[in-house]
């Protein structure tokens, strides 16, 4: 049975989070009574409030009010006063993934998994299904520019969701189709070992019903190995790999847009399909790979080649995924969520492919534990940047780890032979350096999952204050 509409008031603890806000918005649109709380105000909360959802700032037991159900994310600790109050009242306490799973149970669902690229791929799959008049429900881990939100109601039979592997709860999601973009060493604080991460993705794929299928990236060694071990589920492979069922080739960048072809070889029918001269208004081979996963799903669901072509060409992107925030004197400024070495490397490579100028990177390491666990990878992921600035670590509630801070990262990047890497303290340092070293045609790329996005939007305005010309533009 579906969640009864008369279940009563549903209270979200941490409602401002990107995943929680999307679920809350969809439930509200379905007619459920929703409220929530969070530690601080943000744009997600403002959007929910504009829809009539009551959101408390700060966590207090009294915030529960008349709530009959409480939804929490794994970030909510058992010492949270609202969690304690819910337990004392013997209210059902539901994890975020369980509530998402409830929404998925009564639709045909596509779950996008992988260490990197989930949000963009989810958005692309949604865009192609939308173009094909599937009218999907969507719950994403980022703001889809075309919708202005991370959630889309949709009245069709299909649902597209981002499957967050960080706490293992993605295994609860009942999907008919899954995507695995890549598998890297991440979230070891939860899993304990990389082998445990591998095993979770194996279960993710094998949870697909016999009538569904998995779409897996053959360019990633870990995913290729996993695909070879799946013998009781239908698997469609994709990537640049010549052996992929859905292969992209002839990639090039023109005017900040990716151009490529796709060759689809069906193992079921033996039919070969070519899609030539596809255009994606995004930079980077990694985004073409994500688009190829979306193409594989769309083709399998019967969406025509021309609709696929149109859907890709009109794709509006995702907020904080190589998002241009402004320009100054011909210097373009971008904001990106990349905070893992693999993501940073891919973003900087995309920037390098898109400009003939310099690439200037400003990175804010996210969590001391991640910096410690992946320290060697962080020292070598900035090779496509001409100038690197490392900001203080965004701790996200963690305590510092001796020997693994921004200062040590700068020192080791220098030891790895990068000639221009600098330790910075604040935005004013960035303004000083960029105004000195950057020239027209250069890219300035901010990287990180923390507060650095505020710098990315502030920099063009601060640079414009240095002079009184009219060359400034802000997005």
Swiss-Prot record:
A GO biological process held by the record: peptidoglycan biosynthetic process
InterPro entries (UniProt xref): Mur-like_cat_sf, Mur_ligase_C, Mur_ligase_C_dom_sf, Mur_ligase_cen, Mur_ligase_N, MurCDEF_pg_biosynth, UDP-N-AcMur_Ala_ligase_MurC
Gene3D superfamilies xrefs: Mur ligase, C-terminal domain (3.90.190.20), Mur-like, catalytic domain (3.40.1190.10), NAD(P)-binding Rossmann-like Domain (3.40.50.720)
Compartments (UniProt record): Cytoplasm
Keyword Cell division tagged: yes
Family: Belongs to the MurCDEF family.
Protein name: UDP-N-acetylmuramate--L-alanine ligase
Species this protein is from: Bartonella bacilliformis (strain ATCC 35685 / KC583 / Herrer 020/F12,63)
Gene: murC
């Amino acid at each position: 049975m579906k969640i009864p509409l008369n279940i009563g008031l549903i209270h979200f603890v941490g409602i401002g989070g990107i995943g929680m806000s999307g679920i809350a918005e969809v439930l509200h649109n379905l007619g459920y009574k929703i409220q929530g709380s969070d530690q601080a105000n943000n744009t997600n909360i403002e959007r929910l409030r504009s829809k009539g959802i009551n959101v408390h700032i700060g966590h207090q037991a009294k915030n529960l009010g008349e709530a009959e159900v409480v939804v929490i994310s794994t970030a909510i600790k058992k010492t949270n006063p609202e969690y304690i109050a819910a337990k004392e009242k013997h209210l059902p306490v539901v994890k975020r993934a369980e509530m998402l799973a409830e929404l998925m149970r009564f639709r045909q669902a596509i779950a996008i998994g992988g260490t990197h690229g989930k949000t963009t791929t989810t958005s692309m799959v949604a865009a192609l299904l939308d173009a094909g008049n599937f009218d999907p429900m969507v719950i994403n881990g980022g703001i889809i520019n075309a919708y202005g939100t991370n959630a889309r109601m949709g009245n069709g039979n299909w649902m597209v969701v981002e499957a967050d592997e960080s706490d293992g709860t993605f295994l609860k999601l009942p999907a008919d189709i899954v995507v695995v973009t890549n598998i890297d060493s991440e979230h070891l604080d939860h899993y304990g070992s990389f082998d445990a991460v591998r095993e979770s993705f194996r279960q993710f794929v094998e949870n697909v019903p016999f009538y569904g299928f998995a779409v897996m990236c053959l360019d990633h060694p870990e995913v290729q190995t996993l695909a070879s071990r799946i013998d009781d589920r239908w698997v469609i492979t994709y990537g640049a790999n010549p052996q992929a069922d859905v292969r992209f080739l002839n990639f090039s960048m023109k005017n900040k847009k990716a151009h490529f072809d796709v060759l689809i070889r069906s193992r079921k029918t033996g039919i070969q399909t070519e899609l030539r001269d596809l255009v994606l208004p995004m930079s980077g081979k990694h985004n073409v790979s994500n688009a190829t996963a979306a193409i594989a799903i769309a083709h399998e669901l019967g969406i025509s080649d021309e609709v696929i072509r149109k859907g890709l060409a009109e794709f509006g992107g995702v907020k904080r995924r190589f998002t241009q925030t402004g320009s100054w004197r011909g210097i373009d400024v971008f904001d990106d969520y990349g905070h893992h070495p693999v993501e940073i490397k891919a973003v900087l490579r995309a920037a390098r492919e898109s400009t003939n100028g310099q690439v200037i990177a400003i990175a804010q390491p996210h969590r001391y534990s991640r910096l410690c666990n992946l320290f060697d990878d962080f020292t070598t992921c900035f090779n496509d940047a001409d100038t690197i600035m490392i900001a203080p670590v965004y701790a996200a509630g963690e305590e510092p780890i001796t020997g693994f801070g921004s200062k040590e990262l700068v020192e080791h990047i220098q030891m790895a032979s990068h000639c221009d890497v600098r330790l910075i303290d604040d935005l004013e340092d960035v303004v000083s350096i960029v105004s000195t070293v950057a020239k027209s045609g250069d890219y300035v790329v901010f990287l990180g999952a923390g507060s650095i996005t505020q710098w990315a939007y502030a920099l063009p305005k601060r640079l414009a204050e240095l002079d009184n010309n009219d060359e400034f533009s802000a997005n």
